[in-house]
Amino acid sequence: INNMEQMGSLFVDYKIVFFYDQSSDNTLDITLERMKSNNKIFVLVNGFHKRVKERTHNLAHARNKMLDFVREKCSNYEYFMMVDGDEVSSSKMDIDVLKRTINRKDWDGITFNRAGEYYDLWAMSSKRLVLSLWHFEQPNTSTIFRDEIYHEIRECKEGELIHAYSAFNGVGLYRTKKFIDSKYDGLPRLDLIPPFLIERTKEILKVGIR
């Protein structure tokens, strides 16, 4: 919450919206207590949607509910953010990176690399590896994907962006006008991916690690 409030302070106004499903700790109690000192915090509680075994479907439901909130309460905001509410997003953030990013015009949606190992491999779809690593048999696929992503990061010059079809990594910033009508379904959409990109991914996996 501290990080979210710090990010929110960069804007003229902000709202922090949590979607609460279930947890084994005191997440909800902590959030409700924080609401007493910050009236910009809102909690949406999952009361009717039945959780399913597919994690992506549960995430899609939660994010769609938050997008509904954006459409109803914040449609005039220039940006909205999606942030994982776990320990990954609780570590110290370089707020200056976000400041510089807001002033750039060369992105519609952007996520941020982190110091250390890239943890959100399953959500990554790059120009060379357009399919998720979970479309392929393990155990070597994760290593190949990780090697490719680190190669792109090493080759990226300071100030440049890495183009991606999909990425998250815990914090995402989106231009509201571009994504206001978006909806998550949690389903694989191979019909949206050009066949040559699928074949490119397969070829890279055949060759293996750089």
Residue ranges and their predicted role:
Residues 87-190:
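Conserved catalytic core of nucleotide-sugar-dependent glycosyltransferases
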